[in-house]
């Protein structure tokens, strides 16, 4: 029985000592992690700015606006015509006298 208690005590001490060593081990340095993170974000921002300066993005934006303009112009004109016709019909209704009730 004493032998079993001694073995259990020895196993417990060894496991606690191992946990203590793990806690004392140097973990990743937080400052270096932040430095790496900010450096990668800076590099990404620089790459993005270089891509934005290229004429490819500008030409794509110009093509998009031209296409949108071509598609919206007829729609706006037809909406304007419909609005004028609607107001004209309202004006014609107001000009007609209502029949008198008998």
Swiss-Prot record:
The keyword Iron does not apply. Its main location: secreted. The keyword Secreted applies. The modification Methionine sulfoxide is found at residue 49. Plasma. GO terms for biological process: cellular response to lipoprotein particle stimulus; cholesterol efflux; cholesterol homeostasis; cholesterol metabolic process; diacylglycerol catabolic process; high-density lipoprotein particle assembly; high-density lipoprotein particle clearance; high-density lipoprotein particle remodeling. Residues 1-18 form the signal peptide. One of its GO terms (cellular component) is extracellular region. Disulfide bonds: none annotated. Keywords: Amyloid, Cleavage on pair of basic residues, Disease variant, HDL, Lipid transport, Oxidation, Secreted, Signal, Transport. May stabilize HDL (high density lipoprotein) structure by its association with lipids, and affect the HDL metabolism. The apo A-II stoichiometry in HDL molecules varies among inbred mice strains, because of structural polymorphisms affecting the apo A-II gene, which influence its translational efficiency. It is linked to Defects in Apoa2 are the cause of senescence accelerated mouse (SAM), the senile amyloid is a mutated apolipoprotein A-II. Monomer. Interacts with NAXE and NDRG1. This is Apolipoprotein A-II. It comes from Mus musculus (Mouse). The lineage of its organism: Eukaryota, Metazoa, Chordata, Craniata, Vertebrata. The gene is Apoa2.
């Amino acid at each position: 029985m004493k032998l079993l208690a001694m073995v259990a005590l020895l196993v417990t001490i060894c496991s606690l000592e191992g946990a203590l060593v793990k806690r004392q081990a140097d973990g990743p340095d937080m400052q270096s992690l932040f430095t790496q993170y900010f450096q990668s974000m800076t590099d990404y921002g620089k790459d993005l700015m270089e891509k934005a300066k290229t004429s490819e993005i500008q030409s794509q934006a110009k093509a998009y606006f031209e296409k949108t303009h071509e598609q919206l112009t007829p729609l706006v004109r037809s909406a304007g015509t419909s609005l004028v016709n609607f107001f004209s019909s309202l004006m014609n209704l107001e000009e007609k006298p209502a029949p008198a009730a008998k």
